[in-house]
Regions:
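Membrane-interface starts of transmembrane alpha-helices
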Residues: 40-56, 136, 140, 165-177, ...
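Membrane-interface helix termini and inter-helical loops of multi-pass transporters
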Residues: 69-78, 154-162, 245-250, 280
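Function-critical hydrophobic alpha-helical transmembrane segments in multi-pass membrane proteins
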Residues: 92-101, 119-188
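Helix-coil boundary and interhelical linker segments in multi-pass alpha-helical membrane proteins
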Residues: 1-5, 154, 161-172, 209-220, ...
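C-terminal membrane module of polytopic membrane proteins
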Residues: 23, 27, 31, 108-109, ...
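Membrane-interface helix caps and helix-loop-helix hairpins in membrane proteins
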Residues: 185-193, 215, 219
């Protein structure tokens, strides 16, 4: 184990510096292959770059467990049926919470359904939102959401908080890890992410509470995170909804991003309250 005299924040910085140094050469090769260069919008080129970043994670985490003399179980990843059940519970909670969020906004007239158009045999076009939801690609998106959420939860709700708790209380450690979690999203779309930073930080805190609620396991947190990623990605890619302009975008979400709006913040607070009430 690294000397206890080494500050936890220094360990965290070394973690991310190592990750960045290993990823940059790969990212440059991927970017050249995709013919992308900053500051061009990433668009559909984000996924290959994200994949290259997260494929390095197992090595970084393995090295960290070896250096710190800990196991994945110490970070909340338990290889047992209870973890799968918790993940399914979290996944359901994430999907249902988003359904309630968008359903209430539709009922209040704050947003409008903007469904895909399906041409009938008589050449008439009808609006059918289910063609966007019940699509084979949604399963792929769900699998990607589970991969992303498992990776991020193991890092930001597992590894980092445990490192930080060597010097700080669990609350302060969670707050710092959630801040890093929020800031890390700036790498992909800085302009869109800035209004979401408070929401992303709060999301990190809620997901930390999910781990506490699950007795230290990351199961609920992974499922909950995946449910949110999956639901929001489906809505975004299929362009299912649009603001009605009846309320300021600060309510529904700046640039149509739920985490950048009061409604999304309320969703996180409500979820956090529910998790607190569920604590084992």
């Amino acid at each position: 184990m690294l000397s206890p005299s080494i500050p936890a924040l220094v360990k965290v910085m070394v973690f991310f510096l190592t990750w960045t140094c290993l990823w940059l050469p790969i990212a440059i090769i991927v970017a050249i292959a995709l013919k992308w260069q900053p500051p061009q919008p990433l668009g559909n080129k984000k996924l290959p770059l994200l994949a290259s970043l997260y494929l390095i994670v197992p090595f970084i985490l393995w090295a960290t467990t070896w250096i710190e003399s800990v196991s994945l179980a110490d970070w909340g990843l338990f290889w047992q049926p209870a973890t799968l059940i918790s993940a399914l519970l979290g996944l359901g909670l994430g999907i249902v919470s988003l359904a309630i969020l968008f359903g209430l906004q539709l009922a209040l007239g704050w947003i409008q359904l903007q469904s895909s158009e399906v041409e009938t045999k008589t050449s008439e076009k009808t609006i059918n939102p289910w063609t966007s939801i019940l699509n084979p690609s949604t399963l792929l998106i769900l699998l990607l959401a589970l991969w992303i959420s498992a990776t991020e939860e193991l890092i930001f709700r597992g590894c980092l908080p445990n490192l930080l708790q060597q010097d700080y209380s669990i609350v302060i450690a969670a707050a710092i890890a959630s801040f890093i979690f929020a800031i890390a999203h700036l790498i992909w779309a800085p302009k869109e992410t800035v209004p979401q930073l408070p929401g992303l930080w709060l999301m990190g805190m809620v997901l930390t509470l999910a781990r506490v609620t699950d007795g230290g396991s990351l199961g609920i947190a992974i499922g909950l995170h995946a449910g949110w990623i999956w639901g929001i990605t489906i809505v975004d890619t299929a362009k299912l909804i649009k603001p009605s302009q009846k309320v300021p975008e600060g309510i529904t979400g700046i640039a149509e991003k739920p985490l950048a709006g009061a409604a999304g913040i309320l969703l996180l607070l409500t979820t956090g309250t529910l998790l607190f009430m569920m604590q084992k």
